[in-house]
Amino acid sequence: MKKQERQRYIKRLLSSNEIERQEDFVKLLRAEDIDVTQATISRDIKDMQLVKVPSATGGYHYSMPVQKQMDTEKKLKRTLKDAYVSYATQDKFVLIKVLPGNGPALATLIEAMHYDEIFGTLGDDAHVLIICKSLAMTLELQQKIQRLLSDH
């Protein structure tokens, strides 16, 4: 597996798990049939600039650097401000319409935010389809989108 693909898996794992040790990364990745060593994970952690932050249980877990998350949110707000046309929801789906050429970038930025509500995103030239994990989470995501749109 290529480094970029493995690091995408690591980001996904971070968004849904509190990972305290490098061995936990190895175990979770192997459960996905991705064969890695602790040394590889160590290099990925350094390369991705992961940090350890306090967890609710009293220990520490790995996280993306806060600055990167803030930069991503700024880019997301700016892209929405520049390209947003409209959005609609139905059941577990949110469809955001944007100016042509902006769909893939917006989908990538939304994925990079690692929102808990999102199961997956699809972006074409002028749309982003977001699939949420539940109806309740669709409403939560809708509120986040409203906040992002009203902040500019």
Curated annotation (Swiss-Prot):
GO terms for cellular component: cytoplasm. GO terms for biological process: L-arginine biosynthetic process; protein complex oligomerization; regulation of arginine biosynthetic process. It is found in: Cytoplasm. SUPFAM superfamilies: C-terminal domain of arginine repressor, Winged helix' DNA-binding domain. Belongs to the ArgR family. PANTHER family: ARGININE REPRESSOR. Regulates arginine biosynthesis genes. This is Arginine repressor. It comes from Lactiplantibacillus plantarum (strain ATCC BAA-793 / NCIMB 8826 / WCFS1) (Lactobacillus plantarum). The gene is argR2.
